[in-house]
């Protein structure tokens, strides 16, 4: 048999009835074959004007030419559409055909349905015609399939225009297209997966203005179609990183799957059966979300295409006329290292059409993909993060051992720290990361509240974050900044801190956070001071306002959550510590200045340096030393404020390096003088204890955790850069509070764009003039709104900057003129020693917690405590199956020719589900 049956409304396909998720056979997703060559798929009716088509398109041989000619000549199938349009002009090139379909999508968005029908019909015919002139079989078949799809859509759109379909706004249906991958190795497949899964990549253009409607609009991930439901989903966010970073991240994930596979069932430290054995890869789904099609590194796309996870031709042709916000590629990867094959990785590559933000990428991941899968656990990480081979195992083990844990993070470290010891910026960050893990996260984990689970590598129990916590997490995506204001806008620069707090304070729950030391991940960090300034601006602003938010809303833990009385009392202790630590950080620039002033320069002036006799110097020389110090320090601070207001750090690189070097020399001089004073004066118990609790804590805690060599090798680097961390980063951050580009740029639709799309330029002359005047008025109001928002944000920036600067200035002047070194320094030492004592006790407590795990497991069973059930949250997934069953029933109703049947809309079906 040759030729394809014309895709008419009366044709009933034989194997396209959608079944519930867990029962849909793979064969039902294939198109009808003739003489061994799959022909273009007929349309599938599922709901209103919507459709769901899954078709596999071969690329080795072209479709028979007669099938295309039969389709074009069968005009009776499109009689209604032709009567409406009555015009047809052949478009001679692929570029013009694609452009016509894009204009059709724009007309459809503007609700100019008859114009859209005309353009879709022209574009569909053009696709079918230009396909015959393509020498490449792959391009020929893709164009032919697109032509069939578009003309079928024209027939359905015509039915809607003439009132035969009841639906509010018609949209092209879901069309998932599969093509063979080029790098398939038939010798590799072996026992892990079948040939079909290994050879095929699937692409779906996604039109979904709101990701939460992904499932309701009929989109399905490939693993759902094949009856799989992964228990662990991993989100990898990507922006413009190179291919080497993505390659390293994926291979480290494959190593983690191999480690999970080798776990022995029944062992005391083994995971449940889903995360062990040869089929462990089927319970893990990796989602790579790229923020903007134009922003992705071209070589990264080349790498993705090489491994079968991207195809430019497929995207260009099949997304035409859809107006897709996201391009979805799905494939089970086959990676190898040095000829050794790794476990398969079920992978989804979501390429967003427009740049929005990392938060928007998480919005797609959580509300579209994870909401459909309903995994038990979900992890988030950045491209470039490299997990050690057992990192995922340790996180999953913590979740399975204690079902009260709602979120957990591993130990994040700097990549190749010892190879970069000559780079002081990298070494200082390595010290900071280590101390944060050893002291801060260990302390917070003892209380059950980790202030921030880093987006570079952390994991959550999906049950703990689904609902209210995620709604709060994505708040800035749904509400305009004019309404939120600058405080909340800056707070959401550290949205992961908000998510952590919302999980712990969740109403009627008692979730806790946990730090897993053995789950180690290496990450790439900024290599120079300028790059670090830009990064820390986002971190510091977000952390400061998020901390104020958590302090202000701490009462929710007591009034809304179901934590035990003992846990709430522990949170009260942590709240006091958190409050003192935040206050100390606010006045840290003044305290740093005062410490340098009293230790070095006033000691030099008053001959209090035991190892240097300054009595022989004239008073003028002694006073000049103090004046020079004050002038240099103040000049450096003023310079930082001036260049921080409205200047990009990249344009002031030399200035920042100069100021950082001056502050670094002052800090090193202070450290040497302080060491000289300590070793030249008689030792007392008080001085030894204070010294240990201020500086020795870093070495004691790191030695306890077996990482003291990291601290020894990078302590000098960090000491020299302390003034840069305190002064440069903080001043630049407060000088740019009005800049929220990291968390909010491009997150909101432009109302002017929507207005221009709705403008039809139809009607009489007066109507057109009135519409143009209305659009001009809208533009004027939008301009005023943007200017007012800019003024409000800049005023907020100025007020906060002045408050912070004058608070530190007044505090420093008060101490200098009304206190002495003998009064201030002991108070400072005791305060710092007290905070560090708390951190040390927390580090020791976490060390004891780790090394008594076996004993606690025999005494305390937390496998069924808390909110976790240890099972899937089945309710939502059952609703999803009911939703797709309803779509399948609508499809069968339409295909059987029962034209009088009541066809439900997508919203009606989702409400019923």
Curated annotation (Swiss-Prot):
One term of GO molecular function: chitin synthase activity
InterPro entries recorded: Chitin_synth, Chitin_synth_fun, Nucleotide-diphossugar_trans
Transmembrane domains' residue ranges: 539-559, 581-601, 625-645, 658-678, 684-704, 711-731, 800-820, 825-845
BP GO terms, sorted: cell wall organization; chitin biosynthetic process
Induction behaviour: Expression is low in the mycelium and during most infective stages except at 48 hpi, but increases in sporangia and zoospores, and peaks in germinating cysts.
Effect of residue 742 to A: Abolishes the catalytic activity
GO-annotated cellular components: plasma membrane
Intervals of motif Conserved SWG motif: 741-743
Record's bilayer topology term: Multi-pass membrane protein
Region Disordered: start-end pairs: 1-27
Disruption phenotype: Reduces mycelial growth rate by approximately 10% and retards sporangial production and zoospore release. Also leads to significantly reduced virulence.
Listed result of changing residue 433 to A: Greatly impairs the catalytic activity
Impact when changing residue 495 to A: Leads to 95% loss of activity
Cofactor: Mn(2+)
EC nos: 2.4.1.16
Active site: 496
Effect of residue 452 to A: Greatly impairs the catalytic activity
Annotated residues for binding of UDP-N-acetyl-alpha-D-glucosamine: 237, 241, 291
Effect on the protein of changing residue 432 to A: Greatly impairs the catalytic activity
Superkingdom of source: Eukaryota
Record's keyword annotation contains S-adenosyl-L-methionine: no
Top-level enzyme category: transferase
Regulation: The activity is inhibited by nikkomycin Z (NikZ).
Function: Polymerizes chitin, a structural polymer of the cell wall and septum, by transferring the sugar moiety of UDP-GlcNAc to the non-reducing end of the growing chitin polymer. Involved in mycelial growth, sporangial production, zoospore release and pathogenesis.
PANTHER family: CHITIN SYNTHASE, CHITIN SYNTHASE 1
UniProt-recorded name of the protein: Chitin synthase 1
Origin species: Phytophthora sojae (strain P6497) (Soybean stem and root rot agent)
Taxonomic lineage: Eukaryota, Sar, Stramenopiles, Oomycota, Peronosporales
Gene, per the UniProt record: CHS1
